[in-house]
Amino acid sequence: MLYEQIQSNKRRTVFLLIGFLALVGIVGAAVGYLLLKSLVTGIIGALLVGVIYAVIMISNATDVVMAMNHGTEVTSADQAPELWHTVEDMAMVAQVPMPRVFIIEDESPNAFATGNNPKNAAVAATTGLIALMNRNELEGVIGHEISHVRNYDIRISTIALALTAAISFLINLGSNWWLFGSGSRDRDNRDSGGGGQLLVFILSLVVMIFAPLVAAVIQMAISRNREYLADAGSVALTRNPQELIAALRKLNSAPPMSHVDESSAALYISDPLKKKARLFDTHPPIEERIARLEKM
């Protein structure tokens, strides 16, 4: 079962990368038209941006994501003994190399894993998580993150994060140019042009508006399924669902994190933004996760 899940995640990685490039190309066409009146130039430029983002994120995933989330590396057990030894123990049980360990200075309890594969993975925990959880609950949370590492979920998450970051960059570039740059002077020309030109202009705006939602849908589909799988994986490592159940209840009642990179929100074990009733929530409701764990 584990081998099949790993292979499935690898196949999904390929499909996600194809979808990533396609979506970036569409956004590039829209931005290229708004900026340069050239769909082809926009597509080529956007694909170059997308490839650069993907390569950077995949090859330097740990350092990039940790920098985005203000993580500080723990280089020895003396710096954070409980966290260090918990990560060490869970990695040993899961039979994966010990990930690098990071701490995020934030009173809200949370954690995430990142990297490209189990050999260069990393686990981050907030100071709030270390302070709030007892050893068993901490094992449940870290077991969840180690399961992401073992199942290659971190690679999929890294590519999804690159997708979101690249699209945000392109849309911000296009929006700023259109509103404040020479694009603002071109609007009258486009409006007075032919109907076909105006139609392409409108479609370009529609793409820029809805592309982030498409990216969110992709992240949501990936994140929801992998969270359930990682919960089950944590129980397989700790042999006690009550550890993770207790931890999830504490996470559910915690306040939002003070400083968090929004594009990284899907990586965390619990929604760090604590936004209620979001249409495109990347996390399944904690109540549903607890209900599934109680049936194990």
UniProtKB/Swiss-Prot annotation:
It is a multi-pass membrane protein. It holds the Pfam family Peptidase_M48. Keywords: Cell membrane, Hydrolase, Membrane, Metal-binding, Metalloprotease, Protease, Transmembrane, Transmembrane helix, Zinc. GO terms for cellular component: plasma membrane. CDD domains: M48B_Htpx_like (cd07340). Zn(2+) binds at residues 144, 148, 227. InterPro entries: HtpX_protease (IPR050083), Pept_M48_protease_HtpX (IPR022919), Peptidase_M48 (IPR001915). Binds 1 zinc ion per subunit. Its EC number is 3.4.24.-. It is an enzyme of class 3 (hydrolase). One of its GO terms (biological process) is proteolysis. Its cofactor is Zn(2+). The chain crosses the membrane at residues 14-34, 38-58, 159-179, 198-218. The active site is at residue 145. It is found in: Cell membrane. Belongs to the peptidase M48B family. This is Protease HtpX homolog. The lineage of its organism: Bacteria, Bacillati, Bacillota, Bacilli, Lactobacillales.
